[in-house]
Amino acid sequence: VPSSLKVNEPTMVLFPKDKTTLRTTSIFPPFIGSSYVGFKEALGFKESSGNYFITNTYGYLGKYQFGIATLNLMGVYNASQFLLDPELQERAFYTNMTRNKWILRKDINRFKGKRIKGVQITESGILAAAHLAGAGNVKRFLRSYGNHDKCDAYGTSISEYLQKFGGYDLSAIRPKRNPKV
């Protein structure tokens, strides 16, 4: 045996343990939180798992699952181009939020802080529900105190979105009448 491989003195050795303990460092990206960015990322993940390039079984497009009629309202007329352009999708989402905030501004002021069907009503919950079911259906839900709880084609209700997306700070979104991308 060569002298370089001989053990001449006691050596510290680590033996395998019965259980391996892994230490992980948690990294919290800036979008995890209660800001507009946190809101849009959470909603985008719920709608499409964050996939910009997906079309669902009902023809809704992109990360935020927009319908053609809603896109047309905001001045987007080419669905193929929309689907391939993440930046356009982000602009369209913001534009739609400003539009819904304009349509629902009086209802936001009237119902914010109240409880309907056990759900605390917040501005962000209202805007998320409007993204799901349309501003008119959210108005009906609020004004009927939850008796008109419309669901989408997959069975997700207005009250579910009100709860899931409540509590975000959307003060950065300014209401705008008839906005265009």
Where are these regions (language model features)?
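Extracellular glycan-associated modules
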Residues: F39
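Polyanion-binding surface elements
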Residues: L43
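Alpha/beta-hydrolase active-site loop
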Residues: R91
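Short Gly/aromatic-enriched secondary-structure transition segments
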Residues: T57-L61
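Non-catalytic cell-wall polysaccharide-engagement segments
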Residues: V1-I32, Y36, K46-N51, T55, ...
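Short glycine- and hydrophobic/aromatic-rich loop-to-beta-strand nucleating segment
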Residues: Y64-F66
